[in-house]
Amino acid sequence: MTAVVRRTRWTAVAAAGAVLAALAVGTAAGPASAASGPAAVVRQDAAVPPLDRAAVRRVLAGLPTSEVSGALVHVSGRAGRLDAVGGIGDPATGRAPDADGRFRIGSISKVFTATVVLQLAAEHRLDLDTPVQHYLPGLLPASFPPIAVGQLLNHTSGLPNGADGPWGDGTAAWFVDHRFESWSPERVVATMDGQEMAFVPGTAQQYNGMNTFVAGLLVEQVTGHDYAHEVQQRIVRPLGLHDTSVPAADDPALRHPAARPRLTVPGPDGTPRQVDVTEQSPWPWAEGGLISSAADLDRFVTALFRGRLLPPAQQEALFTVPDVPTHHSSHCETGPDAGRACMSMGLERTKVGGVEIWGKTGSRPGWTNGVFATRDLSRTVVYSLNPTGLDGAETPVIMQLAGAVFG
């Protein structure tokens, strides 16, 4: 599998994170995790400006375009609130996106997974410095070196990307033809068989969804319960997240969708046609298969940042970035600290307009999403766009929204 395909598979969703980083005026290194070496504490050094609601609405008024059919934006915090939509949510009816509807959150699922693993660490049911091979013997190739659990969470494991799998060739046409195929997490992890490690664990950072598949299997091994059960009992139910779920592997449905996105692909005669991709396999599972809504993601991040889900030691890990370089990663490659790690055990850190924000991007074909907040929650933003392709052409819209939301 080529490097281009690997980039499409795990990091096409990173376009939003890269855009936010591109807007950054600077980032600094955060405190280190036990698994990854030294780091320094980061402080927010710019106040959040008043929310320019008109600027956000102007961006949304430019939709639909050939690259983005619709979008929703949810902003909260003491510096201003807004719920707004733009473009078309359902091309069949022409209706606008539903600001209260659900969408496939993609890699934002990783934050839920990391939170559960950190909770298990707080309960002394696993140790972040213990090799994952201790808990899951035989899962990884025997040739792989010991990989600490914490290194899975902050992407310093050095795991390879995996060979041919459910991501195909990364094109919209391939996805449309295979969108209902389901892969088990074990089968996805097995695509690493025969591959070499990308780097020595703990020496660099490379965004890789394979880390989170292994972390999800770790949750099941340690608890004896399904991953979905643990997310439900530990996060969804306590916080009252009524729109958030981990779909069953054989359930492609999306109930009460915010939008019914369509991908543009070549028809039989070569002319473009649009295919509704609302229903699709949730095979990304703990790595990227969850469903949620803007309100639920806001509630989750608010509880997470306020320490309602994690005790102090694990909360510190959530806001800790290892002091290591990146390794062939689309993340952390812009701004004054380009080439240095920007991801913690669950979150990504960047700056926009001098304001330090933490959060996560995530996408599935048909959706490009993000949830970011200042650590003091003076501003939280959730966005969900509906791109018509898989080539990152929605990036300019995200840039405009980021600039409008954070000034």
Stretches with model-predicted labels:
Residues 144-356:
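Short, surface-exposed loop or secondary-structure junction motifs
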Residues 52, 56, 105, 109, ...:
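Hydrophobic (often cysteine-bearing) scaffold residues that line and stabilize catalytic clefts
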Residues 1-36:
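Secretory targeting and sorting signals
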Residues 2-3, 30, 34-85, 275-407:
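Catalytic loop of the DD-peptidase/beta-lactamase superfamily, centered on the K-T-G motif
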